[in-house]
């Protein structure tokens, strides 16, 4: 797979995206959807992130230098991001949670739950009932 840039950091009160992207990036790192070489090269920072000694936005701005792209992800991570993030579902989930939560830690927890739910749905093979429903729907 070739390198693909998903989004670059933006600054400003209304346009800042570091919190939104940092939460997704932290979830991806914490769920081992990162490239093995990236893990080795950034072991200390990844450990800090996993121990919550570094936030997702800090990791995004310092380790990834504000560039959210495919280079640090493994194939499964890239595929998931391209469906969930580029498909717009992550932004929808993030905005739904953000509108009802003011506390940053609580927001991160709720967003993480949404990402986990989407990921489980992504990796879970469709059941026979779902396959049959899809076939019958096209008739």
Regions found by a protein language model. Give the residues of each.
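Amphipathic protein-protein interaction modules
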Residues: 51-121
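Context-gated lysine
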Residues: 40, 44, 98, 117, ...
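Short hydrophobic short-linear motifs embedded
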Residues: 131-138
């Amino acid at each position: 797979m070739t390198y693909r840039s998903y989004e670059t950091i933006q600054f400003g009160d209304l346009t800042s995206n570091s919190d939104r992207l940092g939460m997704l990036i932290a979830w991806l790192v914490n769920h081992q959807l990162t490239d093995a070489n990236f893990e080795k090269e950034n072991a200390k920072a990844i450990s800090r992130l996993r121990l919550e000694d570094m936030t997702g936005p800090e990791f995004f701005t310092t380790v990834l230098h504000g560039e959210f792209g495919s280079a640090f992800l493994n194939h499964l991570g890239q595929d998931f991001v391209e469906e969930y993030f580029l498909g717009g579902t992550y932004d929808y989930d993030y905005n739904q949670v953000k509108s009802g939560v003011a506390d940053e830690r609580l927001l991160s927890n709720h967003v993480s739950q949404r990402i986990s739910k989407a990921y489980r749905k992504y990796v879970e093979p469709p059941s026979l009932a779902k396959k049959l429903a899809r076939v019958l729907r096209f008739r």
